[in-house]
Amino acid sequence: MKSIKIGIALCLTVAMGSPALTSEKAAFKISNKSSARTKQSTTIPKSPQQDSVVLQDDKDSLVQVAFKRVNKADLLGGVSVVNVSRLMEKNYATYSLENLEALAPGFHGNIWGNSSYLVLVDGFPRDANNVLPTEIDQITVMKGIGAVALYGSRAAKGVVYITTKRGGSYAQKVNVRANAGINTPKAYPEYLGSAEYMTLYNEARRNDGLTDLYSTAAIYNHASGSNPFRYPNIDFYSSEYLSDSYNRYDLTTEISGGNETARYYTNIGYWSNGSLLNFGEAAGNNRSNRFNLRGNIDVKLNRVIKLNVDASASFYTGKGVNTDYWGNSATVRPNRFSPLIPISMLENGDDPSQIYVNNSNYVIDGKYLLGGTQLDQTNVFASIYAGGSNKNINRQFQFNTGVDFDLSGLLQGLAFKSTLAIDYLTSFTQAYNNNYAVYEAGWNNYAGYDQISGLTKYGDDSKTGAENISSSYYRQNIAFSGQFNYNRTFGKNHNVSGTLLGYGFHIGESEVYHKTNNANLGLQLAYNFAQKYYADFSSAYIYSAKLPEGNRAAFSPTLSIGWRISEENFLKDVSAIDNLKITASAGILNTDLDISTYYLYQGYYTYNNAAWYSWKDGQLVHSFDRRRGNNFDMTFPQRREINFGIEGSLLNDFIGFSGNAFFSQTKGNIVQPTSLYPIYLSTGWPVYSDIPYVNYDNDQRRGFDFSLNFNKQLGKVGWTLGFNGTYYQTEASSRASDSQYEYDYQRRTGRPLDAIFGLRSDGFFMDETDIANSPDQSTLASGGVKPGDIKYKDQNSDGIVDTRDEVYLGRGGWSGAPLTLGVNLTAKWKNLTFFALGTGRFGAKAMKNTNSYGNYFWVDGQDKYSEVVRGRWTEETKDVATFPRLTTGTSDNNYRDSDFWLFSTDRFDLAKVQVSYQFPARMLGKGFIKEFGAYVNGFNLLTIAKERDILELNVGSAPQTRFYNLGVKALF
């Protein structure tokens, strides 16, 4: 406890700017083996091939892996690493994992085809979005089974380990960075104006055998725009409501330094981000901001004990209004109502209406009352003008400490380390919720011009002044580890290491009864001979309360080997080869990640959610219904994997490369396989099931990743070019659900895990004769099909098109695109640096359905019409139509998953371009500014894709943006 108090006091001293810990000594450097390997020496070169062009100096030689840091030359594959602190010198970023898929092979939004990953910050489970790039030293992506084994069950799908910055043994440094930029929208949805909507809605009614709803005169008046208050034409994306752009700015100060006894680091940051909304209360409540403070200190108490204390706090406030503007923009039709009622157009002598004006709390700009109708008594515009505002508050505090004991006095090479972390997060919404009245105008033009003859009022104005608290959320993380480490070299060449550890964490959340837990023991034994031959055994003994007693613990072993063949006699004298190493790993990792909840092994009865029954009319009673059977033999699902790796450098580090191939199986996923049991064990009504959850479904994943880097000085320009890529395939190798399918093409076994199934379209029905001569589709449409509806292929030739005719259409890329590519280019001339980064995603498809695009593409009933309906089917356009006929009913036949709505998500994005200039030292003189630089950059500048218009489209949410930024940085 005394040590913790000392550490906290030292952190506070640093934050207050005390120079007591400064040192005039030169900057501390981690020693590394020479990069210029001679053929007479067995020293191993630096490895720029380790997956990122930014890993090219000696400081980067140590890589954070599970519970330790190792020389990157000694990595055994399945690990990618990015030096964020060095990358930020030429690539300013705003998010911790920004463009990571273009820098770390194997990462494609997830890792090696899996659906999630564990994020660790300094070894503890934390949110990636709560640590900024300016705070990060290094990001390690642990992909292979051997790399993640020590973390146990929760790491079975991979680990992204974020290492934050720390101080060093050097005189105090103060780094300041400031940025300011603007965001501009890429694209907005395009909806029809009032007149066009009304015209096409009339057409939809005629298609349904109904009469027109809107008269020709009404359509003309809406089209003319002569009186937008009487004949509204709402455009949510006009400059009346939105700005052309919004700004973002940030400021970061870093203070670091220390000596051989104590080292410290402090990061103080602030950012603020705006919004496009620019009217009503949104104009003053459209910003979010965040203040953060991070500090750590490393203290060498004596020759045996070292201590570290880390703490961070963040304070986020997001201001907004009490409505969903973007959601309403996708649903509110343009002619529905007028947002504002002009007071100037009130008829003279209309005293009742004038009383409304005089008594209103909300006269907008002194000229307007809030508009609405009986059906729109609360609406998005009135809510923004008068409904009040809110603040979303998020506060996080994170604390961790660790102590290291050098036990070489007991046994040479022995050490002990223990860590403890306690994190708190709380969030809630503070809101002022106001009530307001809206008014519907009654119009006349008997005077020869439009005027309001009367107002109908709906609702009342009221302000309580009370601040309402809602959406409260609380989370607590507690993590602990303790480990014995052994590291010793025998006879100069025999390097032996081992780790015995205990590791665990639990995450408690508000309104969640069971905490998220991870607990395991770990054992690692490693050996390498002269950095030529490697062997590593990593294992975990895990525990999970989600399994039945007797099956809650399991052993997860892995084995990795490596061979640096460039040190063998047959390659040692090949001057073109600087370094060449091959690796292999295999293992079994037990996991409870995909066990959705607790007690699945235990059957249960339900009462509250059961069916009703009664022996007497008017008196209903719940039954007791069984929902699942017992399975006390349930075991852990397992990740079984073998992977192979290669890495090397050629031609004196002109070329660096790495690659991994992986073959992984997830065996024993837990499902309730209704179709595998007799039908009498389950019923649909009342809902009853005696079928247990069992280990049955199996998945497969296989693929490869690679990196290829080139470094060359051409004249006065230093060039670095890097390519990264990840390709993976998935397969449902066993599915209990397949027994419900009648035909082979329906079955999920053998298909990708992200398989999209749907019908195959065959154009449109051209007329009634075409319908009569085609397979029956009446089961797809409750009212039957009509000319202009989509025609589908009858896959099983039974004369009926139904869900049994759905086939495999493509991969959804839900865990990341099947093929992810990244390219980065750096050119440095004197003090000027150019950097560009691009990402490519290929091989996936998506549906233009309501899940992604609301009713933008699937338009029927009372939906708002988008520009896609201009290609609708009519008798005149039947040969060139690109969209089904319009209807005011429910278009069950047309709006279902089929290849008609399928599109490719293949794309290449120019994600970043930055030009940086470092001012020469002679320009700065001998003042207090030691270094000064400036840069300009652009984010998300260009997308090249066949379906770019769709890929850049957001429906029902704020638009995607491009960001242009100017930044400066200085060292004091």
PLM regions and their residue ranges:
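Short, small/polar-rich motifs associated with maturation and membrane association
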Residues: M1-R294, K306-N308, W719, Q740, ...
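Extracellular/periplasmic, surface-exposed regions of secreted and cell-surface proteins
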Residues: A9, N296-I305, A311-F315, D350-Y356, ...
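Short aromatic-centered micro-motifs
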Residues: V119, Y527, Q795, A827
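Outer-membrane beta-barrel proteins
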Residues: F124-G167, A187-Y191, P232-T252, W271-D310, ...
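Conserved small-residue
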Residues: N175-R230, T323-D324, N328-V332, Y598, ...
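Extracytoplasmic gating/loop element in the C-terminal half of outer-membrane beta-barrel translocons
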Residues: T378, A382, P787, R841-A934, ...
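C-terminal extracellular loops and terminal segments
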Residues: D690-Q700, Q740-F757, L809-G822, T826, ...
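Glycine-rich, aromatic-lined ligand/substrate-binding cores of catalytic
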Residues: W814-M847
